[in-house]
Amino acid sequence: MLTTTILILLIVILMVSLHLYYRWYLLRSSPFNRTTAASTFFTDPSSTPGGLNPSIIKSLPIFTFSAVTALFAMECSVCLSEFKDNESGRVMPNCKHTFHVHCIDMWFHSHSSCPLCRSQIEPFAGGVKSSMDEVAISISDPVYGDTNHHEGTETTGDSVPEDSQRKPAAIEISQRNLGEIENDLSRSHSFRSPTDEPDDIFHSEFESRSGEVLLLLLLLSEFLIFCFRRSVACK
């Protein structure tokens, strides 16, 4: 009788302990506490990065929005308002996100990343750089033949008249047209928040851990019931 009572007390204590542990695990793994714990931190104000250099801000490409030629409505993520006709905006070189010029310039006074996806705005190499790649083609006049006669004087191929020594002309050809820029803007419009995917991973991991804890509880309860029946049968 004493052995049975002790086994029952042990079973009750173990079940209560497992129940308390399971509740603690659920509270610890909840998204609310996870967000609160992740957002509670302290930073040194002296180590906080400053804004972008004004020369880098001016080098970012600018476009003029047109409601007639635009394929879709564009929205500035800083002021949360849509672009209107003939409004100027800036395109981020890495992520291709678009913002109002005055909104993003004010943002870059104290930040150095995109306000939407947090990608760093890297300075252009070699100073200010155009948003479109350009190809320079040099065209020069052909050199005259081996011998030339000018006013009755014979000249060899080494001496070339001054009129023929002209500077080469450079023609700049843009490699990107307006259609490619609109395609880049359309891809940036379908931007997905980077916090969506980690949430899905967290929920799947949480469900798998919950299943493991429940399975452990069932196995322990079956084992304790087996021990209890064994002790009763021995009597």
Curated annotation (Swiss-Prot):
Reaction catalyzed: S-ubiquitinyl-[E2 ubiquitin-conjugating enzyme]-L-cysteine + [acceptor protein]-L-lysine = [E2 ubiquitin-conjugating enzyme]-L-cysteine + N(6)-ubiquitinyl-[acceptor protein]-L-lysine
Bilayer topology term: Single-pass membrane protein
Gene3D superfamilies (alphabetical): Zinc/RING finger domain, C3HC4 (zinc finger) (3.30.40.10)
Highest taxon of the lineage: Eukaryota
Zinc fingers, RING-type class: 76-118
Pfam families: zf-RING_2
GO MF terms held by the record: transferase activity; zinc ion binding
PROSITE patterns attached to this UniProt entry: ZF_RING_2
Cited InterPro entries: ATL1/ATL16-like (IPR044600), Znf_RING (IPR001841), Znf_RING/FYVE/PHD (IPR013083)
Disulfide bonds: none
Region (Disordered): 143-167
Localisation per UniProt entry: Membrane
Pathway: Protein modification; protein ubiquitination
GO annotation, cellular component aspect: membrane
Regions crossing the membrane: 1-21
Chief place where the protein resides: membrane
Signal peptide: none
Enzyme Commission number(s) of this protein: 2.3.2.27
GO biological process: defense response; protein ubiquitination
Induction data: Up-regulated by chitin.
UniProt keyword annotations, A-Z: Membrane, Metal-binding, Plant defense, Transferase, Transmembrane, Transmembrane helix, Ubl conjugation pathway, Zinc, Zinc-finger
Annotated function: May be involved in the early steps of the plant defense signaling pathway.
Family under the similarity heading: Belongs to the RING-type zinc finger family. ATL subfamily.
Comment text on domains: The RING-type zinc finger domain mediates binding to an E2 ubiquitin-conjugating enzyme.
Protein name stated in the entry: RING-H2 finger protein ATL17
